Amino acid sequence: MGFFDKLFSGVTGGSREPQKPSGVELELRRRLTVFASYEATQDTPLRYFLRWEGQVQGVGFRFTNTNLAQARSLTGWVRNMEDGSVEMEIQGAPANILSHLEALHASYERIGTRFRLVDAQARAPLANEDGFSPQIGRAHV
């Protein structure tokens, strides 16, 4: 059964345990939680470069990220890479980025799609970025 068949039929990933976040993702979540908990930094936009591996191509991963980011007023982009990974830059309030990560996992958990965050790097926020968009095509590694 293909991805979209599973999605529309409501079939779950079977008896597999829910996927645990990678060490990279746990550290990112810890940092975001700290920033979100202090009044001085809770609304300060942060920007991160993220790279995901696993079942991230051919499953609507870019478009799911786009929809989740737009719903949380985040900016940035997401693109497929030739090596099968997905890269993105995401910017916004720490609590909104944290919510995005949680919603991303929840979106794929019920159909058993496995992926993990393998790289997370802080970047300088962009002042004039407008929106979040998928980049079409594959970028070279």
Stretch-by-stretch model annotation:
Residues 2-138:
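Intrinsically disordered, low-complexity, mixed-charge
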